[in-house]
Amino acid sequence: MKRFAIFAMMTTAFALSALAQRDETAAARVPLENYLKGHATGDGEYMKKAFHTEGNMIFVRDGKYETRSFAQYIAGMSGKPAADEAQRKRWIEKVEIVGNAGVGTIILDYPQGKFVDYMTLLKIGDEWKIVNKSFHFEPKQKPNQ
């Protein structure tokens, strides 16, 4: 009977831990979903919900390391969907979290090319935020090339 009680307690603890992790993963997806909505609509308010105010984009362009603040990125948004929005696809590929830190991978598949975004996530207080973003862009060849 003692073994059964120990087994039952361990099983319950494992199940509760798994449920808590699933809830936390769902919460960590919220800023990623806001990021996707920002791209779909061109509305910087979604990006403000997604990004931490002190975060940065980090990337390589023409072989050079570059950074851009999230504030600069948001300021460049048009406020309306892109003209080719109907041809654009975007999704959350993966989210991994441990404790209050995580990483999200997002795919932006656009007519001109494919972006792979790697988002560093932190839980600050009760809210998850994207604190840094790095990305790779792969241009698509035009049909005549």
List the model feature ranges, each with a label.
Residues 16-37, 41-45, 49, 142-143:
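Short, low-complexity N-terminal intrinsically disordered segments enriched in polar/charged residues
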Residues 35, 47, 55, 104, ...:
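Hydrophobic pocket/interface hotspot
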Residues 21-27, 60, 70-114:
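Surface-exposed, charged secondary-structure patches
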Residues 7-15:
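Bacterial N-terminal signal peptides
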Residues 43-81:
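N-terminal, post-signal-peptide region of Sec/Tat-exported proteins
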Residues 114-141:
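Short beta-strand edge/turn micro-motifs at domain boundaries
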Residues 1-4:
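Positively charged n-region of N-terminal signal peptides that target proteins for export
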